[in-house]
Structure formats: structure tokens, C-alpha cells
Amino acid sequence: MNCYFYTFGCKVNTCETAGMQSLLQSAGYTVVSQPEEADIFLFNSCTVTASGDSRLRHAMRKVRREHPDALLVLTGCYPQAYPDEAAAIPEADLVLGTKHRSRLPGLLAELCQNHARIAAVDSYGAQDDFEALPCDTMPDNTRAFLKIQDGCNCFCSYCIIPYARGRCRSLPPEELRKAAAGFAENGYREIVLCGINLGFYGMEWDGSLAEAVETCAAVPGVERVRLGSLEPERLTEEQLSRLAALPQFCPQFHLSLQSGCDRTLRAMNRKYDSAEYAAICQRIRRYFPDCAITTDFMVGFPGETDEDFRDSLAFAQRMAFAAMHVFRYSPRAGTRAAAFPEPVSYTHLRAHETLSD
């Protein structure tokens, strides 16, 4: 049977889609590049914002209208965070979360045999293992994205991801080396290391992100190593010194800011204040004078005043980011911020002002 994938959200989802494609191909399925050729449609979802949920449901309804006899599989962060909502989506024949994705071929076989809807979302525990999906190619990409970390322990007040991904866990260095070698053997010269909270890589064995980059850079054939999105507080002096010693390391840092206002950062339950964030950026630029630092910037968080917004915007301007991803606050059921007062009005005007400046 032919399978077609829709991938929403971050680069971790891109990695996991490639892994699921590899799993299905090993089980005898064919992954196709055109939806018209598919018998099975798989939707790897993101649930960071409500608009992401809406795009997902719209895509599933459209596919069901155009392919009424196809099988539709919903997987990823949305069903993991909201399993009952996901199971109630009428278009979904199989619902699978972010845990135990290796079960996918068996669940599909069961679905094809019994023709009965399946909901198979397993809950995370306190100490889950890292699930590495087999993958040594990235269709339609000239660089390889390698997931080395999963989960988050931070519980920012607005964020659903700890509930969708479980606690922090890491790909062991030897498995990382083997995965990077597989990509290199298939001609990939650049590898992007990805994770949900990438800076926490190796915390289980007192390791570090620098260790991961060193392991990857030591693989024959790997010429460039990049990092995915980072939380700022774990980039220590020692780690930056080790990264600066690696000629393969590409100094591009995406450091999530969210707000430059300390009052808002406290309400968000972020683990730094604006002065600490600025010091981290200064430290990075000391080791990498020509680096690019990019960031995420949230507007309209509950309780944000005009003065808070002006402080936040002024701080972002002082940081001289190479680029900013600006987005509106989106309430997520189950988070602490969802119970806060309503977000401020005219958020879209503030986002426009930020982008214009």
C-alpha cells in the first residue's frame, strides 16, 4: 500500500516523519511523493498553537473529502496532549501519540485487517527511554536532521509541550555516532542536531550538548554540524569553548527569548531574566564574533501591558537579532496560563509593529 505524509511543526517532527517512513518501508509499504497515489495518509501533528490544531483538522477534512476510501492516521503532539479530542476526530482511522511510534507498522496492519478505528496513545511516565526511529536519509533535504533529545522538564506556564513529549531524555553518544555515520555514508555532509529542549542533551549521564556536537563532528564525512532551537540558560562558558574548538561547527544559534520584559518572563515561568539572557548572547558573541543569533518573540501574553510590551521590544532591538519569529500568544488547555486573565487586545497590531521595526 502507498503512504503519503503531512508534517506539521518543528524539525523534530521532520526527523520523526523520516523515521516513520523508514519503518513503513521496511514493513513493505511504499512512501509516495504525490497524494493522488496514496492509500494511506499520515498526519504528523504539532499542537504548540490553536492555529496549528486548526490547520491539521482542515487538512484531514480535505483529504477525507478527496479520498473517501483512504486510511487516515493521526500521530504526533496533538493526540499525545489531547488524546480524547484526537480520538473524536471522525476522519482519523488510527490515532497514535508521540510515544511508541515503532508500533506504527503493526497498528496499520491491524487496521487494514479489522477495519475498526484504533486509538493507541500511551501515556508518558517519569523515566521513559529515548525512542530512536531508524533513519539514514531525509527525502527532499540536502542536510540531515538528527533528533538527539526529546521531552522537556521546564513547564513554562503557556506551553503544552511537556505534556505532549514527556520528560527529558537523550540519544546515547554511541547511537548518535552510528546515526550520523549512516547519514554520512548516504552522502550527507551537513547534520542539524535537533531536540525538544536540545540544551538538556545528556543530562541523564552528566553529559552536554557540546559532547553531542563533538561526537557528530568526529564522524568521517561530516563537514558541518548545526544546532536546532535552544533554550538559552544551558549554554555555559565551558560548552561554548568546546564548540569554538570544532571547525565543523556552524555558529548559528536560535535562542528562544519569548519576552524581554522581566515581569512577563516571571509570569511565563521562564528560567532566566533579561539580564541573564543578554549575558548569554554576549558570551556567545565573544566566542563567535560573526555568529547569527535568532529568536522567538511572543506578543499578547496574559497581563502584558503597553509598558511591558515596549520594554520587551526595546530589549529585542538591543539584542540585534539576525531574525525573529514573532507570534501571538495562543491559550493551550491544560497549561497554567490558560487560567490567566484574557490576553491583551490588539495583539495583531503589536506583532505588526514588532515586525515593522
Model-derived segments and spans:
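Proteins enriched for Cys/Gly/acidic motifs involved in redox and nucleic-acid/cofactor modification
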Residues: 1-200, 238, 243, 249, ...
